[in-house]
């Protein structure tokens, strides 16, 4: 399966020649072509997984906001999605800030912030490192 790019104004398309097209900017296309074959395989595996398991997209709003925050900083609070410049700042934020006790992904309620953080890490694999 090879990717081809088809020019369409300011947008480019990635295609597997089987009818699935993804709109990307020229910058995104350049970055895609710089990826290793393993990274490209991972992207295809993620897309296939989401196509075969669309229920995973039920958490898409939260996951999109999480990824957007991660683009700013690798240190993001999993409960409020606030980005921080360091791991220390994030841990201080979690320790001293009162957070919601509701899971931002599945909306399950908890009695403490710690139990909500524990749940988000164990059930949704979004952990504070």
UniProtKB/Swiss-Prot annotation:
Top-rank taxon: Viruses
Gene3D superfamilies: 6.20.390.10, Classic Zinc Finger (3.30.160.60)
Start and end residues, zinc fingers (C2H2-type): 75-99, 101-124
GO molecular function term, any single one: zinc ion binding
SUPFAM superfamilies recorded: beta-beta-alpha zinc fingers
InterPro entries recorded: B129_C2H2-Znf, ZN622/Rei1/Reh1_Znf-C2H2, Znf_C2H2_sf, Znf_C2H2_type
Purpose: Essential for virus function.
Record's protein name: Uncharacterized protein B-129
Higher taxonomy: Viruses, Viruses incertae sedis, Fuselloviridae, Alphafusellovirus
């Amino acid at each position: 399966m090879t990717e081809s790019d088809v020019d369409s104004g300011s947008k480019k398309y990635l295609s597997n020649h089987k009818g699935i097209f993804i709109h990307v900017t020229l910058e995104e296309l350049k970055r895609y072509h710089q990826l290793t074959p393993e990274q490209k395989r991972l992207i295809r595996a993620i897309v296939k997984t989401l196509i075969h398991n669309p229920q995973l997209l039920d958490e898409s709003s939260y996951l999109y906001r999480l990824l957007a925050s991660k683009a700013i900083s690798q240190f993001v609070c999993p409960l409020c999605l606030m980005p921080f410049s360091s791991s220390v700042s994030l841990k201080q934020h979690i320790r001293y800030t009162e957070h919601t006790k509701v899971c931002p992904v599945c909306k399950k309620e908890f009695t403490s912030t710690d139990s909500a953080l524990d749940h988000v890490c164990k059930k949704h694999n979004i952990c504070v490192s």
